[in-house]
Amino acid sequence: MRSWGSYRRGVVLLAALTLLWRGWTISRWSWDSDDWIYLADTESLGFWEYLWQDYNGHLMPAEFLVSWVVTKAAPLNFWLPVALASAGNVWLWGRALAALAGERLVLLAPLGLLALTPLMIRPTIWWASSLQALPLQITLALMVTAAARLARGGGRRDLAGLLLALVVGLLFWQKALLLVIPT
C-alpha cells in the first residue's frame, strides 16, 4: 500500500532517530587533529582570510564559513550542527528516493540504512571530516532529486537546481566535482 502520508511520517521518524543517534554519539567524542586547527584559525586569521585560506592544497570557503559560525556561536560544541546536518541529510535523501521511485514505503529500508549505519559514525564525530562528508551527501541528494525531475521532463528550474547544488558542493570541497561523473 502506497501512502505519501505514511512515507513522509517514516522519513520524519528516521530523521528524528538520526538526530538523536548522531547527537548521542557525537556528544561523547572530543576534538581531533584538524578540528583544533580550525578552531585556532578562527581566532588567529581574519574572517576573509579564514574563508579563502589554502588548507593543505584545498579551497573550501563554505566549509570554513560553517566552521567559523559554529565556533563563534558555540565554541567546542559541534555536536548539535552535525546532528542537525545528519538529520537534514536523511530528509533530503528521503526526497531524492521519492523523486526517483515514487513515495513507496519500501524506500524507508535503504533510507534507514543511510540514517543509522555505523559507517557514518567516524566521519560525523570528527568535526573537520563531517564538514566534508555531510555536505557531499547533501549535495548528491539535491543533485539526484533535480536530475530525477529533469529526466521526467523538468525545466530550467530543475537544471538550475542541479547546477546550484553542484556549485554549493564545490564551495564545501572540490571533490564534489566527482559527483557529476555519474550524471
Spans of model-derived segments:
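Membrane-interface alpha helices of multi-pass inner-membrane proteins
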Residues: D158-W173, L179-P182
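Start-transfer (signal-anchor) and selected internal transmembrane alpha helices
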Residues: M1-L19
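Helix-to-loop transition at the C-terminal end of transmembrane segments
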Residues: L20-Y38
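Membrane-interface transmembrane helices that cradle and orient dolichyl/undecaprenyl
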Residues: L140-L159
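Aromatic- and kink-enriched transmembrane "portal" helix at the membrane-lumen/periplasm boundary
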Residues: V82, L107-T139
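Extracytosolic helix-loop segments that constitute the early lumenal/periplasmic catalytic or substrate-binding loops
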Residues: W36-Y55, A62
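Transmembrane-helix motifs of polytopic, lipid-linked glycan transferases
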Residues: A83-L107, L142, A146
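Short hydrophobic/aromatic helix or loop-helix immediately within or flanking a transmembrane segment
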Residues: W52-P75
